[in-house]
């Protein structure tokens, strides 16, 4: 244990712990990325986790708390597992407390070649007396059996979905049963967004969120929680750390009449997003049926601006039936017939948009 696990700072004894979760190493993510993009993403996540361990040790952290789902499945490649174990061995002064989550399986904890600074939790409550901190956790423990000394700083690791009461699944956590158990900090994993809540008069609970988003449903900065114990208190701070971020950018295209003009506006809107990040543009507003945004062309022209680009077209057509009352062209007849059909307005717009593209000689976007 490093420096007797404590340091004197302005006459206050303190320790520094890092809480992370949901790294999901080796996640396939084939539904999000093309094959090469998925491989690049997996390398980036492993690189970020390695950087976190190195940063923790370099900046004087006493321990890294992993609250579940370090790996995405129990079929993680041997190469990735060995990388992680070698990483831990390379930082012997940093204690690693690893709680397996619902994705991890038991492959890692069953190995015989674990480094000496890696500490794991069983199914029931497992306790570690770590300097001024008591660390407890379990993969499926009975909350009623939790016993923590009131005079200590107590940190508990659990993985699952918090529920208010009643019976839940194996990976559900009852807040009510953990109240008044002398918990100072409840380090949670399972949700991929940072959240914090008051546990009781003494303790707080935090989901650290994932270290890097896994799709456009996990946009925004991701990272870890820094814990500092000062005079038997726990201070916590969320620290953004992900090297790559998912962004969703809504953009009103009303009034834009050409693809180059719209492309220029979108480049300006997204100019502050790093090229290594992932971006989804959501186009909104009303557009002239004669010149709707050319999504495929925009996708092609802007693709090199980000590691991954998706464009979602949520625009609606600005159609006034009176404009086509006396139009004797094929286009006018087509629009009148569609507007007179029993289809709902959304389906009518889709049909008209496809039809107009076909009439212009373009490939319809079905």
Regions found by a protein language model. Name each.
Residues 19-21, 63-69, 95-102, 106-107, ...:
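Active-site neighborhood of phospho(di)ester-bond hydrolases with catalytic His/Asp-centered motifs
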Residues 33-127:
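Core catalytic region of metal-dependent phosphoesterases/phosphodiesterases
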Residues 84, 104-177, 181, 204, ...:
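Conserved catalytic scaffold of divalent metal-dependent phosphoesterases
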Residues 12, 231-366:
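Accessory, non-catalytic peripheral segments of nucleic-acid enzymes
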Residues 168-233:
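Conserved beta-sheet core of the metallophosphoesterase superfamily
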Residues 14-18:
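Extreme N-terminal starter segment of soluble prokaryotic enzymes
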């Amino acid at each position: 244990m490093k420096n007797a696990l404590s340091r004197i700072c302005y006459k206050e004894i303190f320790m520094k712990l890092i809480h992370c979760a949901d790294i999901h190493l080796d996640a396939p993510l084939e539904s999000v990325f093309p094959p090469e993009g998925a491989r690049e993403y997996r390398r980036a996540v492993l690189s970020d986790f390695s950087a976190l361990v190195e940063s923790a040790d370099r900046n004087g952290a006493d321990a890294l708390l992993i609250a579940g789902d370090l790996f995405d499945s129990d079929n993680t490649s041997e190469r990735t597992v060995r990388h992680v174990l070698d990483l831990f061995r390379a930082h012997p002064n940093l204690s690693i407390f690893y709680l397996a989550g619902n994705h991890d399986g038991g492959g890692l904890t069953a190995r015989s070649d674990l480094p000496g600074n890696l500490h794991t939790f069983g199914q029931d409550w497992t306790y570690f007396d770590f300097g001024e901190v008591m660390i407890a956790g379990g993969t499926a423990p009975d909350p009623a059996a939790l016993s923590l000394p009131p005079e200590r700083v107590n940190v508990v690791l659990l993985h699952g979905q918090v529920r208010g009461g009643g019976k839940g699944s194996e990976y559900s956590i009852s807040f009510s049963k953990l109240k008044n158990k002398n918990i100072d900090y409840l380090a949670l994993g399972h949700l991929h967004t940072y959240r914090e809540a008051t546990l009781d008069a003494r303790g707080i609970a935090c989901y650290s969120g994932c270290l890097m988003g896994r799709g456009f449903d996990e946009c925004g900065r991701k990272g870890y929680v820094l814990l500092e114990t000062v005079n038997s208190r726990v201070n916590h701070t969320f620290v953004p750390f992900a090297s790559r971020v998912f962004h969703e950018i809504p953009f009103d295209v009303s009034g834009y009449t050409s693809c180059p003009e719209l492309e220029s506006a979108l480049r300006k809107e997204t100019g502050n997003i790093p090229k290594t990040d992932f971006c989804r543009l959501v186009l909104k507003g009303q557009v002239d049926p004669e010149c709707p945004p050319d999504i495929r062309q925009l996708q092609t022209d802007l693709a090199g601006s980000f590691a991954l680009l998706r464009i979602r077209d949520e625009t609606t057509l600005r159609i006034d039936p009176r404009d086509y009352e006396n139009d004797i062209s094929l286009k006018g007849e087509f629009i009148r017939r569609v507007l007179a059909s029993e289809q709902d307005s959304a389906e009518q717009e889709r049909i008209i948009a496809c039809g107009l593209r076909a009439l212009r000689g373009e490939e319809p976007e079905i």
